[in-house]
Amino acid sequence: MALNVRRLITGHDKNGKAIVKIDEIAAHVREGRPGALAVNIWTTNTNPANNSTEEDAGKVNVGTTMPNGTVFRMIEFKPGVTPRMHRTDSIDYIVVMKGEIDMELDDGVEVHIKEGDLMVQRGTIHNWINRGKASCFLAVILVHADSAVAGGKVLPAHG
């Protein structure tokens, strides 16, 4: 499995009939850091989301998160991916689609996750480390959130 992602996006025709509007292999892959490739499947920039837009929201240029919205992406972490401790202003729903990877927290604690595991990342500083011999593929949905607060201290996005 390379980062070869089929995007299926539904919508409606002018009569309100459900149709498949997009059925393609996503070609807009970007390298976020050496060893980490990502492709956005879909994004939204409002809550509630607009289900009537004609724009291909998977091709919108977006950073890690979308202010007031969501980002659905597939990420490939290759073995030896460059470290990047970071925190986002989002709640991230993560599914390990294939492979395995270690998530490192800011105090050095590591958690090993593997294919089929599910994670909810709630604005914590973390890093992804792939010590294996094969790529790890994560499906990630990022939902914009307020910065995390702990002990009365705001923990803003960084990295």
Report each predicted region and the residues it spans:
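A short hydrophobic beta-strand segment most commonly corresponding to one strand
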Residues: 92-93, 118-127, 133-150
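Short acidic-glycine-tyrosine-enriched beta hairpin
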Residues: 107-123
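N-terminal leader/capping segments at the start of a protein or of a new domain
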Residues: 1-50
